[in-house]
């Protein structure tokens, strides 16, 4: 289902953790806004459950999407997201997520959004629900998603290692050439040695 749950009159949390479309990119959350319900943005309406896929309906090419894992009970997301809840008996949410975040689908959704009549590129949740998808058996979906998830984890690890190495190189450069230049080193013009 899409957008199955929203805040209603019986919503019992006074404080919410709000996620807007600009605070998540390619599954990475930059942060939540903790806010009292009475002061929440007007778009703070969508409720999410574990393994729901959130996909921004505005400018799909910006890749504001993610999959919800172990949400706090008071997590609320923007109505700018389509919230997709998978039928766990038939589909693996991670498989659907990888499908929806593939370049081919993102580019297709961006093309549809660009053709919209609104003031900015956007699409309706119906566009997402009407995408054709090949569904292997549930065990195959889980296997495919597991492999892709493992590759994503390795890519994330490599990015973190690169950041660490860049920081180390910068520190060593500063230490060797700025802070602790050897007394015996001669100062000269670069043009004299090249």
Locate predicted features.
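Well-ordered mid-protein domain cores that form the structural environment of catalytic cofactors
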Residues: 101, 106, 111, 132-134
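A short beta-sheet element
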Residues: 44-105, 118, 124-125
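Hydrophobic residues in beta-strands and at strand termini
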Residues: 21, 86, 133-135
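Sequence-specific dsDNA recognition surfaces
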Residues: 1-53, 68, 191-194
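Generic alpha-helical structural context detector
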Residues: 56, 82, 97-101, 110, ...
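Non-catalytic DNA-recognition/assembly elements of restriction-modification systems
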Residues: 1-10, 130, 134-194
């Amino acid at each position: 289902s899409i957008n199955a749950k929203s805040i209603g009159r019986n919503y019992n949390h006074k404080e919410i953790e709000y996620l807007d479309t600009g605070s998540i990119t390619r599954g990475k959350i930059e942060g939540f806004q903790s806010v009292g319900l009475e002061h929440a943005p007007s778009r703070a309406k969508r409720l999410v459950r574990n393994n729901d896929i959130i996909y921004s309906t505005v400018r799909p090419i910006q890749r504001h999407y993610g999959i919800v894992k172990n949400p706090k009970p008071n997590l609320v997301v923007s109505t700018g997201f389509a919230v997709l809840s998978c039928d766990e008996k038939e589909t693996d949410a991670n498989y659907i997520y990888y499908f929806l975040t593939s370049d081919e689908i993102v580019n297709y959704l961006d093309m549809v959004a660009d053709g919209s009549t609104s003031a900015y590129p956007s699409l309706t949740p119906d566009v997402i629900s009407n995408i054709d998808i090949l569904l292997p058996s549930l065990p195959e979906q889980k296997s495919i998603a597991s492999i892709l998830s493992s590759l994503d984890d390795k890519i994330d690890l490599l990015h973190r290692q690169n950041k660490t190495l860049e920081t180390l190189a910068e520190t060593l450069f500063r230490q060797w050439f700025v802070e602790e230049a050897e007394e015996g080193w001669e100062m000269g013009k670069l043009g004299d040695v090249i």
